Amino acid sequence: MELLSSSPAQLLRPNLSSRALLPPRTSIASSHPPPPRFLVMNSQSQHRPSISCASPPPGDNGFPAITTASPIESARIGEVKRETKETNVSVKINLDGHGVSDSSTGIPFLDHMLDQLASHGLFDVHVRATGDTHIDDHHTNEDVALAIGTALLKALGERKGINRFGDFTAPLDEALIHVSLDLSGRPYLGYNLEIPTQRVGTYDTQLVEHFFQSLVNTSGMTLHIRQLAGKNSHHIIEATFKAFARALRQATESDPRRGGTIPSSKGVLSRS
């Protein structure tokens, strides 16, 4: 068999005879630019929704303006001054506070309970009261509660965007207290505490029910207080104030799904 030999130059030389067999290329003029190498998805595609990363317009200080949509108006503060021949009471409550308590009623145990209201409700509570405590604590206890209820009423305003309802069960050692409330504008108190002693320190334990009845009357809330367990008078009363504070906090906080509307099918929550 005879081997064919070719030089390197011959191997690299193009085969003119095979190129001649190809048809000549035809150039087609087009006014459109060539298509892009990569497919660009339409921003309206249902498979890949477009996401805007544009910054908000600058504010007065040159930084992007930040806006927050809150269904609850700012500065929900209620302030009341109540003066009679028996007592002189001033109350200021900030529903959107930080749990700051500053109370001086002349009744040490009541001051301690108002501390629970502020701390567990995260309300800022300022109370000043003087009264005829040389007789007993009844008038001061009552008028402080009346003023707190009125301050709550003022702070809530039209009650737009709030949860309206609150429910909490608080334990304190052997005591267990359940509180459920509705900022309905209809005053009612359901109360079944069984406090075993007549006094805690110098405080008459009968005044606990009278405190909440007075608060309900002026605030216009529906309030139910139930004792599920408990033997120690101090524990029962303190757990009651803690549960009340937590339930009131729930009821006054914002419901973002409500969008600032009044939480009632009637469209109004009125004290009257």
UniProtKB/Swiss-Prot annotation:
Keywords: Amino-acid biosynthesis, Chloroplast, Histidine biosynthesis, Lyase, Manganese, Metal-binding, Plastid, Transit peptide. It catalyses: D-erythro-1-(imidazol-4-yl)glycerol 3-phosphate = 3-(imidazol-4-yl)-2-oxopropyl phosphate + H2O. InterPro entries: IGPD_sf (IPR038494), ImidazoleglycerolP_deHydtase (IPR000807), ImidazoleglycerP_deHydtase_CS (IPR020565), Ribosomal_Su5_D2-typ_SF (IPR020568). This is Imidazoleglycerol-phosphate dehydratase 2, chloroplastic. Its cofactor is Mn(2+). It holds the Pfam family IGPD. Weakly inhibited by inorganic phosphate (Pi). Competitive inhibition by 2-hydroxy-3-(1,2,4-triazol-1-yl) (e.g. C348), a potential herbicide. HAMAP family: HisB. It is found in: Plastid, Chloroplast. It comes from the Eukaryota. Its main location: plastid. Coiled coil: none annotated. Substrate binds at residues 86, 112-120, 138-142, 164, 186, 234-242, 264-266. Belongs to the imidazoleglycerol-phosphate dehydratase family. Its EC number is 4.2.1.19. Mn(2+) 2 binds at H138, E142, H210, H235. Residues 24-65, 252-272 are annotated as: Disordered. Residues 41-53 have a biased composition (Polar residues). Signal peptide: none annotated. One of its GO terms (biological process) is L-histidine biosynthetic process. GO terms for molecular function: imidazoleglycerol-phosphate dehydratase activity; metal ion binding. Residues 1-52 form a transit peptide.
